[in-house]
Curated annotation (Swiss-Prot):
Catalytic activity: ATP + H2O = ADP + phosphate + H(+)
Species of provenance: Kluyveromyces lactis (strain ATCC 8585 / CBS 2359 / DSM 70799 / NBRC 1267 / NRRL Y-1140 / WM37) (Yeast)
InterPro entries listed in its UniProt record: Actin, Actin/actin-like_CS, Actin_CS, ATPase_NBD
EC number per UniProt: 3.6.4.-
SUPFAM superfamilies listed in its UniProt record: Actin-like ATPase domain
Protein name: Actin
SMART domains linked: ACTIN (SM00268)
Acyltransferase recorded as keyword: no
Function: Actins are highly conserved proteins that are involved in various types of cell motility and are ubiquitously expressed in all eukaryotic cells.
Top-rank taxon, per record: Eukaryota
GO cellular component entries: cytoplasm; cytoskeleton
An annotated Gene Ontology molecular function: ATP binding
Record keywords: ATP-binding, Cytoplasm, Cytoskeleton, Hydrolase, Nucleotide-binding
Amino acid sequence: MDSEVAALVIDNGSGMCKAGFAGDDAPRAVFPSIVGRPRHQGIMVGMGQKDSYVGDEAQSKRGILTLRYPIEHGIVTNWDDMEKIWHHTFYNELRVAPEEHPVLLTEAPMNPKNNREKMTQILFETFNVPAFYVSIQAVLSLYSSGRTTGIVLDSGDGVTHVVPIYAGFSLPHAILRIDLAGRDITDYLMKILAERGYSFSTTAEREIVRDIKEKLCYVALDFEQEMQTASQSSAVEKSYELPDGQVITIGNERFRAPEALFHPSVLSLEAAGIDQTTYNSIMKCDVDVRKELYGNIVMSGGTTMFPGIAERMQKEITALAPSSMKVKIIAPPERKYSVWIGGSILASLTTFQQMWISKQEYDESGPSIVHLKCF
């Protein structure tokens, strides 16, 4: 493999697709993992209307489109739309010819086997890539924090995973998944804003609520205490201007929405919170590795970006752990992109170059080669 050609790194998330070149310190392109199709027949002839739109363009025309996310809960469910997203990534965002660059893709932990094969097949057969590799998202986050052992809490838009990793290998028996992530927090925020009299219902309005969430929400260190403070003073209240100029006020909703991460029962989900799930995952690991895991709890993904989340996590895990245990939460400022950054680091290592699946190997063995070479 020629060392002159930069590998491409694509992190396909349920909410956002992050793409760029190996060796860069941040992704060049970050756009919503959305494919939109017109809701109505176009009447303006020669308007150059397309039958589908991807990413930001779909987002900006969201008023006239039906938006679909091909990745649900971290796993690809619609391959035709997924192909459109990859096509858009190569040709419109990165402006590269995929047949000239090795491609590293990321996948969710516990991704079904046939999904990995399908991914491999599309990249080699549709896009003709010269070499390919697929890597587990949480493992890449750990790499980007400079560790090979630790437990990663990766929470994005569609799914949250807790993945313990020892010496670079994930421990599959202890991986836990919670189907509760950013999109659910946004939906919950829509619901509690409705109780205040602000109604948001369409897919387009949901994006406004997502923006409110990202700009104003935070995690309370002590929920009950914070609720009390909020009821007695207006210190918590903030205002937000909607696209039409109307200004709304948001109070205890700011911390009530992200609280769902610690108490999924408010969403009528029978799951344990992210704190309890992290603890449960550690307890499923061998007793000899637990100490190292408690001391290396790494947060990654956009849903871990709420102010106050690391402090709250520290408090909750310390309460669950044995009393003498040193608990350390690592929440790097760039954690929104740490999966991508880890991929960028991995794909540019000289030692990694023999790990790629080459087109020749694919032609000889078919899609199942991915299970032999990527783990």
